[in-house]
Amino acid sequence: MDLKAAKAELREKSRPYQTYSYYLIIPIFIILVFLLSLVGYNKGTFGTIVFVFVFFAHVWASKLDLVRKRKHVAPILMYVTQGLGVVLMVLLVTEVSAGGTGNIALGLSSLILLPIEIIAIVFFFISANDIKKAYPTMKEDAKAARLEYQELRRSK
């Protein structure tokens, strides 16, 4: 086997494990962001980081043929929350610039976005479980493909 084919095989065999890892890490990270915001630590970049990870996980999950279609539910719900967040931010800025305090938009955003994100978290865990059931030997397959690729790379 040549190096290029080994690299393609490594990519293909490690994809389920990478996707599984992302589908576990993303909801844990979202929960940590929730907890940090309850403590009073708000950082605007967390949402962007989560969005990027969700995008990559969704692209990788779409290439997993053995997993059911509900693997797309959690990322789509996160896209919806990001889009609604932008719309609600515009509403907040509009209300504040009109002389209001912004409380209506903030209350509306918490009533809409939080349940959607909680449902997305649940679907991330459900999808991770589906990936684990569809690819029971994914970790071993990824390690074996990585070792084979590294051996070929060292030999050349």
Residues of each region from the PLM?
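Cytosolic juxtamembrane helix at the C-terminal end of the final transmembrane segment
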Residues: 58-66, 119-152
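Generic alpha-helical transmembrane segments
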Residues: 32, 39-62, 80-88, 116-117
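Transmembrane helix-loop junctions in multipass membrane proteins, especially transporters and channels
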Residues: 41, 66-69, 94-101, 129-136
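Loop-to-transmembrane helix junctions at the membrane interface
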Residues: 59-94, 105-107
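Membrane-helix interface and helix-disruption motif detector
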Residues: 34-52, 94-109
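Cytosolic juxtamembrane helix and N-cap/initiation of the first transmembrane helix
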Residues: 1-34
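Physicochemical signature of membrane-embedded alpha-helices that form the seven-helix bundle of GPCRs
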Residues: 21-25, 46-49, 74-84, 105-112, ...
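Residue-level detector of alpha-helical secondary structure
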Residues: 7, 11, 50, 91-94, ...
